[in-house]
């Protein structure tokens, strides 16, 4: 299955959408959309794929993803067990790049916001003091009203634009250029990793799942 293009909705493209997630496990497919997405994991763990990055995520993680960046968050299989009492809690903020660009006519502001959008196209894992400040403001976004929400959102943008407390996730120059054949392979590998989350998985195993040699598989993920 190739990454799906998801339409977040026209009304959202002119505003900010806040989604509070409380469910048994994460269910969104490998997908992308034309919005920026800020994800705060309050309670959950597993593996995430952002572009060509594959890594673990845990409680407290904060990630900014730019427009058209394929991504998926996969919970440990134990979350899906019928008797599991585990729950996912997260806050997700969607906002349009156009909304950011149109915030001000000041060229210096536009340049700063533009630079943030460019950085976000590789996915940013945010840590340190920047993370703590943003998480506090996301609480206001989720629970506040009116002008307080707008002020909190602008505060988040200010921190994201000014801070160096982040790590890139996807590699330099990554572009969403998956072919259907490539994405079928990726999906097979992702599903296998999800089912065998607690096991040590060898390169030979995942290469076989992708129907590739080990060396070809390594080149494929470069």
Q: What is the predicted role of each segment?
A:
Residues 78, 146, 197-198:
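Short, flexible helix-adjacent loops and helix caps
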Residues 1-64, 69-72, 76:
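Generic protein-terminus/edge-of-domain signal
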């Amino acid at each position: 299955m190739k990454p799906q293009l998801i339409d977040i909705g026209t009304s959202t493209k002119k505003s900010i959408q806040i989604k509070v997630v409380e469910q048994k496990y994460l269910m969104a497919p490998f997908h992308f959309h034309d919005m920026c997405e800020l994800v705060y994991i309050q309670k959950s763990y597993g593996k995430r794929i952002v572009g060509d990055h594959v890594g673990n995520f845990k409680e407290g993680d904060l990630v900014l993803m730019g427009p058209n960046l394929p991504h998926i968050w996969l919970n440990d299989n134990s979350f899906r067990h019928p008797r599991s009492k585990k729950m996912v809690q997260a806050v997700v903020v969607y906002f349009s790049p156009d909304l950011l660009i149109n915030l001000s006519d000041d060229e210096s502001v536009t340049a700063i916001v533009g630079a943030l959008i460019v950085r976000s196209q590789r996915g940013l894992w945010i840590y340190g003091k920047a993370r703590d400040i943003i998480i506090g403001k996301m609480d206001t976004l989720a629970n506040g009203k009116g002008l307080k929400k707008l002020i909190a959102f602008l505060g988040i943008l200010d921190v994201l634009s000014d801070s160096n407390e982040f790590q890139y996730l996807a590699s330099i120059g990554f572009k969403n250029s998956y072919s259907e054949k490539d994405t079928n392979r990726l999906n097979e590998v992702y599903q296998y990793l999800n089912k065998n989350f607690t096991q040590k998985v060898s390169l030979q195993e995942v290469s076989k799942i992708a129907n590739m040699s080990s060396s070809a598989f390594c080149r494929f993920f470069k």
